[in-house]
Every structure is written in C-alpha cells, then in structure tokens.
Curated annotation (Swiss-Prot):
It is an enzyme of class 2 (transferase). PANTHER family: NUCLEOTIDE KINASE (PTHR23359). The gene is adk. Monomer. It comes from Escherichia coli O8 (strain IAI1). This is Adenylate kinase. GO terms for molecular function: adenylate kinase activity; ATP binding.
Amino acid sequence: MRIILLGAPGAGKGTQAQFIMEKYGIPQISTGDMLRAAVKSGSELGKQAKDIMDAGKLVTDELVIALVKERIAQEDCHNGFLLDGFPRTIPQADAMKEAGINVDYVLEFDVPDELIVDRIVGRRVHAPSGRVYHVKFNPPKVEGKDDVTGEELTTRKDDQEETVRKRLVEYHQMTAPLIGYYSKEAEAGNTKYAKVDGTKPVAEVRADLEKILG
C-alpha cells in the first residue's frame, strides 16, 4: 500500500501517520529524514545532496526523486510506504510519475486555517520518536511527558503563530494545487483520492481512514 498524505501543517497528518504505519506495517518516508540518512551514509546521492546543502541551496527535484526511488527499493518498503511532505509541487508529482513511482492512495486532510493555528500553537513533541501531542486535543497521560518513555515533551520553534501563518500561505500557494492534480489522477484511474475531515476527533479520523484503506 503506497500512500501520500496531503494537508496543511497541523492538519493532523503526523498523528494519523503513526496509526497507518502501525496498522498496515509500512514505513513513513520523510524527505528530510531521507536526506539526512543519505548524507550520513556517504552514498553517491548523499554526497551530491551534501554538496548542494553545504552551498546553502535547495536540493533539486531530480535528486530527491532518485533518493525516493532508492529508499522505496529497500526491504521495509516491500508492503508499501507512506510519503509525507513530498511531493510538494506539481512538477515533483509529475517527476514521481515519470520515475514510475505509483501511488495507491492520496489522502487529503481538510482543516480550516484558524483551527490549524489553534492546533499548532498547543502542540508538544517527543523529539527522539517524533510522537506528537496537543495540550487540548490529544494530551499525554502525564502532562509534559511522553506516554511511552516518560521523557520531557518540547515545543518546536516552528510552532509559533507568526511562523504558522506564513507556512499556511506557502501551503495554499504551492501544495494546494496538488489536490486538483491528484483528483484528476483518480478520475483517470491512476490512484484513489480521498478527502478526510481533519476537524473530527483523532479516533474518528482513524476510523474514517480504516474505512478508506480497508
């Protein structure tokens, strides 16, 4: 099962990604993690990425696609994968298609901007595992502590209101057009597209996802 998650930052993708990974036994592929791992491994692609990043430039779509292809060929992607944060633009989606990376489901998490601002400003994370909590909507069992390890939770610098609003503007300009792109792909029978009401409580969104993914 190959899945792409779409939705603005704070639409609930991270929380549901954890659920999808555990339920369906597929890894989450984040381009940031993938780039860091490639640089660390010292592979040919990793060296190219390091040179570009060291020069303060953005890694090209071609290089990211090559890394995605390399990553999804690994054993743990045998049953599929979950792509989060990629593709971000229509040229990236086109490049994926040209590279023969097919996707079974595109899930759009739909949440109004104001609710997103509320959600992000109250967000707390367990940095080592990536587990995400919220003081109001998804609190940990013990305030300020991770449920699994009991370690301290922190607030990301990115979770300040001004930063959040800037990211939402960027999302609407750059990534939102992918919604139309993948709707058309679904009409052509190339993928399945589903809109998920991300305003619902976590458990209800989870139940909706189970219905969609089976």
